[in-house]
């Protein structure tokens, strides 16, 4: 029986848009923005990589890394562009 590391499994799952969306929705339920930014960074890495997403969003790779770090403070415009570059979009729902 072969084993797979959790991060490798997660990376493969995040390539699926529906899974990635649910993953980000779950991360957004935490009141800590760091949780969401960490999750979004994993989605970016799985769904194109930092260099590709940076190019699609007209951000430098360094800026994208900084924006998605635990100390990042991205604007709505930047978040929307990053999500779009990964094939996702913002959504809002009632509690």
Label the predicted regions.
Residues 1-42:
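N-terminal flexible/basic segments that precede or flank functional cores
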Residues 3-4, 43-46, 91-95:
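Short, charged recognition helix plus adjacent turn
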Residues 7, 73-76:
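Structural motif corresponding to alpha-helix initiation and N-cap regions
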Residues 41-43, 66-70:
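Conserved interaction-surface patches within small, structured recognition/assembly domains
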Residues 75-93:
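DNA major-groove recognition helix of helix-turn-helix/homeodomain DNA-binding modules
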């Amino acid at each position: 029986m072969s084993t797979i590391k959790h991060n490798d499994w997660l990376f493969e799952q995040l390539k699926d848009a529906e899974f990635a969306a649910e993953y980000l929705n779950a991360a957004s339920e935490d009141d800590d923005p760091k949780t969401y930014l960490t999750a979004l960074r994993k989605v970016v890495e799985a769904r194109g990589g930092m260099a590709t997403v940076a190019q699609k969003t007209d951000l430098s790779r360094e800026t994208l890394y900084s924006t998605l770090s635990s100390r990042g403070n991205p604007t709505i415009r930047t978040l929307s562009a990053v999500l779009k570059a990964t094939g996702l979009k913002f959504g809002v729902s009632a509690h």
